[in-house]
Curated annotation (Swiss-Prot):
Protein name, per record: Type III pantothenate kinase
Active site: D96
InterPro entries: ATPase_NBD, Type_III_PanK
Keywords per UniProt: ATP-binding, Coenzyme A biosynthesis, Cytoplasm, Kinase, Metal-binding, Nucleotide-binding, Potassium, Transferase
Lineage of the species this protein comes from: Bacteria, Pseudomonadati, Bacteroidota, Flavobacteriia, Flavobacteriales
Cofactor binding remark: A monovalent cation. Ammonium or potassium.
Keyword Nucleotide-binding on entry: yes
GO biological process entries: coenzyme A biosynthetic process
Binding sites annotated in the UniProt record for ATP: D6, V7, G8, N9, T10, R11, I12, K13, T120
UniProt xrefs under Pfam families: Pan_kinase
Gene this protein is translated from: coaX
One Gene Ontology term, aspect cellular component: cytoplasm
Catalysed reactions listed for this entry: (R)-pantothenate + ATP = (R)-4'-phosphopantothenate + ADP + H(+)
Subcellular location(s) of the protein: Cytoplasm
Length: 241
């Protein structure tokens, strides 16, 4: 059995794999990550491998304390990836974007792939049908958009995600919800159409914490999977061997 760990900007997500199938997932904070992982290992004593990717504050050393119980595989830019990297500044490319791109190559061979990760930030990554990573785009995610409008204005309230009642909001709160949710939806749809216009044999992969919410709003046919990064870590570990 394998335990994969995705250390994000705001939380940690994990998945336990048995025969390459997820049998359980969990979410927890950076503060109590050690006790949470120990609890998972205690409840699943057949776990032999811990696979980690981190864009958050926890680095490799934080997970080496588990090396007396399991083999720890820390995915980094020095790991082996199944694509050619054409990014101009490879040292700045987030490991989460690299892992997601690897997963797209593994699960959808010989296709042009656009991977959209809806988390703290919204990231777009494009890997072509020849397995060449070309780059993408980064913009604020849902929660960040709400927070920025509150933090950088004098009177706009801080709201949490809510489905807008209409396109044209008739209160300040509804205007904020419409701006965040509809604005982000239009952005994603527009980006998809721009990429589609230049590429055939095209698949869209939507993942991240807000994937399920956004999937219902998008007109395009997409493959939505909130566990895609965790699955990609499992596949990438197999690829290292």
């Amino acid at each position: 059995m394998i335990l994969t760990i995705d250390v994000g900007n705001t939380r940690i997500k994990s998945a336990v794999f048995k025969y390459n199938t997820i049998i359980e997932t969990a979410f927890f904070s950076n503060k109590n990550f050690q006790s949470e992982i120990e609890n998972i290992l205690n409840l699943n004593n057949k776990i032999k491998v811990l696979v980690v990717a981190s864009v958050g504050k926890l680095e490799k050393e934080a997970f080496e304390l588990f090396s007396n119980r399991v083999y720890v595989c820390f995915i980094s830019r020095e790991s082996t990836f199944p694509f050619q990297n054409n990014y101009a500044t490879q040292s700045t490319l987030g490991i989460d974007r690299m892992v997601l791109s690897a997963g797209a190559v593994f699960q959808f061979p010989k296709k042009n792939r656009l991977i959209i990760d809806a988390g703290t930030c919204l990231t777009y990554d494009f890997v072509d049908e020849n397995d060449v990573y070309q780059g993408g785009a980064i913009s604020p995610g849902i929660r960040l958009r709400y927070e920025v409008m509150h933090n950088y204005t004098a009177k706009l309230p801080l709201l949490t995600l809510q489905e807008p009642q209409s396109l044209i909001g008739n209160t300040t709160n509804q205007s904020l919800h419409s701006g965040v949710v509809n604005g982000l939806t239009f952005e994603i749809e527009g980006y998809i159409e721009a990429v589609r216009g230049k590429n055939e044999n095209f698949i869209i992969i939507l993942t991240g914490g807000d994937a399920n919410f956004l999937a219902k709003r998008l007109k395009n046919t997409i493959f939505a999977n909130s566990n895609f990064l965790l699955e990609s870590l499992n596949n990438l570990y197999q690829y290292q061997k």
